[in-house]
From Swiss-Prot:
<protein>
    <recommendedName>
        <fullName>Spermidine synthase 2</fullName>
        <ecNumber>2.5.1.16</ecNumber>
    </recommendedName>
</protein>
<keyword id="KW-0620">Polyamine biosynthesis</keyword>
<dbReference type="InterPro" id="IPR030374">
    <property type="entry name" value="PABS"/>
</dbReference>
<feature type="domain" description="PABS">
    <location>
        <begin position="27"/>
        <end position="264"/>
    </location>
</feature>
<dbReference type="InterPro" id="IPR030373">
    <property type="entry name" value="PABS_CS"/>
</dbReference>
<dbReference type="GO" id="GO:0005829">
    <property type="term" value="C:cytosol"/>
</dbReference>
<dbReference type="InterPro" id="IPR035246">
    <property type="entry name" value="Spermidine_synt_N"/>
</dbReference>
<comment type="similarity">
    <text>Belongs to the spermidine/spermine synthase family.</text>
</comment>
<keyword id="KW-0745">Spermidine biosynthesis</keyword>
<dbReference type="InterPro" id="IPR030668">
    <property type="entry name" value="Spermi_synthase_euk"/>
</dbReference>
<feature type="binding site">
    <location>
        <position position="113"/>
    </location>
    <ligand>
        <name>S-adenosyl 3-(methylsulfanyl)propylamine</name>
    </ligand>
</feature>
<feature type="binding site">
    <location>
        <position position="88"/>
    </location>
    <ligand>
        <name>putrescine</name>
    </ligand>
</feature>
<dbReference type="GO" id="GO:0004766">
    <property type="term" value="F:spermidine synthase activity"/>
</dbReference>
<feature type="binding site">
    <location>
        <position position="89"/>
    </location>
    <ligand>
        <name>S-adenosyl 3-(methylsulfanyl)propylamine</name>
    </ligand>
</feature>
<keyword id="KW-0808">Transferase</keyword>
<dbReference type="Pfam" id="PF17284">
    <property type="entry name" value="Spermine_synt_N"/>
</dbReference>
<feature type="binding site">
    <location>
        <position position="252"/>
    </location>
    <ligand>
        <name>putrescine</name>
    </ligand>
</feature>
Amino acid sequence: MEVANHNNNNNGCTNDKESPCISSVLPGWFSEISPLWPGEAHSLKVEKILFQGKSDYQDVMVFQSTTYGKVLVLDGVIQLTERDECAYQEMITHLPLCSIPNPKKVLVIGGGDGGVLREVSRHSSVEQIDICEIDKMVVEVAKQFFPDVAVGYEDPRVNLHIGDGVAFLKNVPAGTYDAVIVDSSDPIGPAQELFEKPFFETIARALRPGGVVSTQAESIWLHMHIIEEIVANCREIFKGSVNYAWTTVPTYPSGMIGFMLCSTEGPAVDFKNPINPIDDESHGQTIGPLKFYNSEIHQASFCLPSFAKRVIETKGK
């Protein structure tokens, strides 16, 4: 798929039948269109397209929006904006890390923009932060256009591995990590494997007893069929605790995104009641204070509407 210039009336689609039409840049506007949310689209007014490129894996675009600052788009789908990225990055990171005492070794799968790294670095107990991102272009673009997000790469505890996250995990010795955070895009294209049962089995093997995983888990308004499958797989694989939490992100489809929070068999993990507060003051001057996460919103994120609660609490039991 080639993303059209916003001064062109092309709708952003190619003629290749194998390449789905998943976005368009019409005069002055970017519209996010995807088969994952049929019948609806979210649009942002474009001031200027800052970058367009095609990596070995996906189309990459950055544009300056009128209301949400700079926007990172992969294969036509918004990944982050300067205005609301905090709601996603802080929650996917601190929900797991604030639920266990003194995490020391953390692995991030995906997350090439560096935002999760930034948030992991707030935890002073952490000694090693590994990240495996498949697309080098995402890392380079983030460092160039989103320095306040990519600041996470400046932490000396960070070890960057460019490659496939599934293959990386298979080579990790069993019980290596206290926490694994899977910051994936939607389950199409290069991220599809990150939503499948064998991947979760590999994560469980890489975690210590009582270790935790946090993974992007779609929207309860749009993807309950995907969430059902994820929950069923996680209940089968993770013998500790399995929970679904969510947060609001205005520029994500339906305005929200969910997370699976799971732990391996071992020391009990109560995700709903954080026990490991962040020493935010010690990092505030370097990466800025928290904008979204706090202990109250941590606990509230596990409260589900009735229709989702019925499905999630019964699936796999």
